[in-house]
């Protein structure tokens, strides 16, 4: 976050000393920007989650974080209470700038927005500063709400709370000419969970977010059109809002510059951007873990995470993404099992996994870097002084500039939205492989788990939904900031469109949450299918072995039969054949298992030579007995094994419990109560996905996600 020069001793001594040192040794702020990116992205996300949960946010003016803004914004979703506190040490600086405005007014000093008109009409002059502020708030109340407290034309209340917090933080720095009592009143509104109603649209975030912020000012001044929403969701007028929040002294009569101080800032755009980035950072880490789980259930080759590969590419986001995936896969029971599969007939299998898995660190790395850089840019913005003019008490002057231009918001939100769309594209590519039996290394088509695949289409509808989500997300990736229109009589001829871009990015976050929850449920389905596969294949293998011993070992008169040598190859067929190609009817002659088992016997018979002419040594003569016995036994054994698994008593436990990715599976299956989806059950995929989506939205998923990575030391595995 960007430090300002402490002019009136209104930050505590320790912070002030640090800020002065930085201003001397790092006058361009580049060193501070670089320092803010030290350490891993994961450590930063852990810190965000911890900050989000703290019940108290203390404002100094220059230390606010994205996580703190998101915390206050989402107060409705927090089980514990919350409170915003203002640093008392800031009072003197705030008062000094307010006094300066009143003194300059009394001396007849000409100052923008105090004695002049606004924007393109600043050539007008007045000595009635209070009336001018009143008119400012009135003409900026140009928004449209529609009907209802949360209509499609009302800014989400979370974004409004974020804007209130950020605006207080800016004004605390003492450059804006506003009374401390007004900041205390806004704080009381936040702490009482009273949220002014702001219009969703109507700002270009260029002279700040003028129109929406004017509705906060309207509530503070008691405008009759002002509305707020109380703690219970009821609609309040200004009188009721002040009473519930215990704001004493009545409505504020704005002094010169105070109206401008309230509305001329970027708080709505940067507040919403803070909410968006808190979620975006978590979603980025989540997808790193989901990509590793994808590698597990797809029997992927883990060498794509090897440190040397990524070290030679140099990009820190890529290196960290690979290291996190490597950590999840290191020691994974799935990886160990997959290694054995890859050793079987290696020349008949692809040497490499497809790009959606193999290049996932290279794809994700730049997106993480973009999101992290955007987070730092917004943290600098929410700690900036962004109104006009700035009151420099130390030099006894008002400085006219353009810090209200919200370009950092528009640019960072456009970039973040593009990064989210890229994450979504990779997620869809992985999902498409996961549900397609041509690519998913033996999982059933559509991840169907029922007994009758003709009446079970699993995740087919979910795949269509994912295509829809991904398409909308790709559309949202289009930039907002290249659609600028010259505004306000060509005075605001360039404008940032910061809030519009933040709103579109909030939409992108919601869509990526839909995709992530759908994908996570599908991955859990795949995990359970691998468990089912392992149990059923074990039964098939044992049954084939037993039937082979019973029917192929002994001849008609008790002698050892040459067919006994077929057993090893029969079991190799079972090992090689994907279970779900025959599991619904294991002895069907149209399915590959029985066809290939018969072919083994036929091949041996063809090699049996003259012995085939002897009925007692003929292998052909044994085929019928072998198949009849298998037909009588195998379907029952397979069904019995399936029933044991469904009752919670499988002979082989689920491998996922031995993996670092287990906490996410545990959340989905145990804590949220989802289950393996089959055609026989009434529950639909959407019902299960809804549970995970809700958990994602209320933060319930954060602890299990971070638990997956709790033992990571922040470095890749050494090159051996």
UniProtKB/Swiss-Prot annotation:
The modification 2,3-didehydroalanine (Ser) is found at residue 207. GO terms for cellular component: cytoplasm. GO terms for molecular function: ammonia-lyase activity; phenylalanine ammonia-lyase activity. Contains an active site 4-methylidene-imidazol-5-one (MIO), which is formed autocatalytically by cyclization and dehydration of residues Ala-Ser-Gly. The keyword Lyase applies. SUPFAM superfamilies: L-aspartase-like. There is a cross-link at residues 206-208 (5-imidazolinone (Ala-Gly)). The keyword Lyase applies. Its EC number is 4.3.1.24. Pathway: Phenylpropanoid metabolism; trans-cinnamate biosynthesis; trans-cinnamate from L-phenylalanine: step 1/1. This is a key enzyme of plant metabolism catalyzing the first reaction in the biosynthesis from L-phenylalanine of a wide variety of natural products based on the phenylpropane skeleton. Homotetramer. This is Phenylalanine ammonia-lyase 1. The gene is PAL-1.
């Amino acid at each position: 976050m960007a430090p300002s020069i402490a002019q009136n001793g209104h930050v505590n001594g320790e912070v002030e000393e640090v800020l002065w040192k930085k201003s001397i040794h790092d006058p361009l702020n580049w060193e501070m920007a670089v320092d803010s990116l030290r350490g891993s992205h994961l450590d930063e996300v852990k810190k965000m989650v911890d900050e989000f949960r703290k019940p108290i946010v203390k404002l100094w003016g220059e230390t606010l974080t994205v996580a703190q803004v998101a915390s206050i914004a989402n107060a409705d979703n927090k089980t514990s209470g919350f409170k915003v506190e203002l640093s008392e040490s800031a009072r003197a600086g705030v008062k000094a700038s307010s006094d300066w405005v009143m003194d300059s007014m009394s001396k007849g000093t000409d100052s923008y927005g105090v004695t002049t008109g606004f924007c393109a009409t600043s050539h007008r002059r007045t000595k009635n500063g209070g009336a001018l502020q009143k008119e400012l708030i009135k003409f900026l109340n140009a928004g449209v709400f529609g009907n209802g407290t949360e209509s499609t034309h009302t800014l989400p209340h979370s974004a409004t709370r974020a804007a209130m917090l950020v605006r207080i933080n800016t004004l605390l720095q003492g450059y804006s000419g506003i009374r401390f009592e007004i900041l205390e009143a806004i704080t009381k509104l936040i702490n009482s969970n009273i949220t002014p109603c702001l219009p969703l649209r109507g700002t270009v975030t260029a002279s700040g977010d003028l129109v929406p912020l004017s509705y906060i000012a309207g509530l503070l001044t008691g405008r009759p059109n002002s509305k707020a929403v109380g703690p219970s969701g009821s609609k309040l007028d200004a009188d009721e809002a002040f009473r519930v929040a215990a704001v004493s002294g009545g409505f504020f009569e704005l002094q010169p510059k105070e109206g401008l101080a309230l509305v001329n800032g970027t708080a709505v755009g940067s507040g919403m951007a803070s909410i968006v980035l808190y979620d975006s950072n978590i979603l980025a880490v989540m997808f790193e873990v989901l990509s590793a789980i994808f590698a597990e259930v797809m029997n992927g080759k883990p060498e794509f995470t090897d440190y040397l590969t990524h070290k030679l590419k140099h990009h820190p986001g890529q290196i960290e993404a690979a290291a996190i995936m490597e950590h999840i896969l290191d020691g994974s029971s799935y990886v160990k099992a997959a290694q054995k599969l890859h050793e079987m007939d290696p020349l008949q299998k692809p040497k490499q996994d497809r790009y959606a898995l193999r290049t996932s660190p290279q794809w994700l790395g730049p997106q993480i870097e973009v999101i992290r850089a955007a987070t730092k840019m917004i943290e600098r913005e929410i700690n900036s002084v962004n109104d006009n003019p700035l009151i420099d008490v130390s030099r006894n002057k008002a400085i006219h500039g353009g810090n209200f231009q919200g370009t950092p918001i528009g640019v960072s939100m456009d970039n973040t939205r593009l990064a989210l769309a890229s994450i979504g594209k990779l997620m869809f590519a992985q999902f498409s492989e996961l549900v397609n039996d041509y690519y998913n290394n033996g999982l059933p088509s559509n991840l169907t788990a029922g007994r009758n695949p003709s009446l079970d289409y699993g995740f087919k509808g979910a795949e269509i939904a994912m295509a829809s989500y991904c398409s909308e997300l790709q559309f949202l990736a289009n930039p907002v900031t290249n659609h600028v229109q010259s505004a306000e009589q060509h005075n605001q001829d360039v404008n940032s469109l910061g809030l519009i871009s933040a709103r579109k990015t909030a939409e992108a976050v919601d869509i990526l949450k839909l995709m992530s929850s759908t994908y996570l449920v599908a991955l859990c389905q795949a995990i359970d299918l691998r468990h089912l596969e392992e149990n059923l294949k074990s039964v098939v293998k044992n049954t084939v072995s037993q039937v082979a011993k019973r029917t192929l070992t002994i001849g008609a008169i008790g002698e050892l039969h040459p067919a006994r040598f077929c057993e090893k190859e029969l079991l190799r067929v079972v090992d090689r054949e994907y279970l779900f190609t025959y599991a619904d009817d294991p002895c069907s002659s149209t399915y590959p298992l029985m066809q290939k088992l018969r072919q083994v016997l036929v091949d041996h018979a063809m090699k049996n030579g003259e012995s085939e002419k002897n009925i007692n040594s003929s292998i052909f003569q044994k085929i019928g007995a072998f198949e009849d016995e298998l037909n009588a036994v195998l379907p029952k054994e397979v069904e019995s094994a399936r029933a044991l698994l469904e009752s919670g008593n499988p002979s082989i436990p689920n491998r996922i419990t031995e993996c670092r990715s287990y906490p996410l599976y545990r959340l989905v299956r145990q804590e949220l109560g989802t289950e393996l989806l089959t055609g026989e059950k009434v529950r639909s995929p959407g019902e299960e996905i809804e549970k995970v989506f809700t958990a994602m939205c209320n933060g319930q998923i954060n602890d299990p996600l971070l638990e997956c990575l709790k033992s990571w030391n922040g470095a890749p595995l050494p090159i051996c």
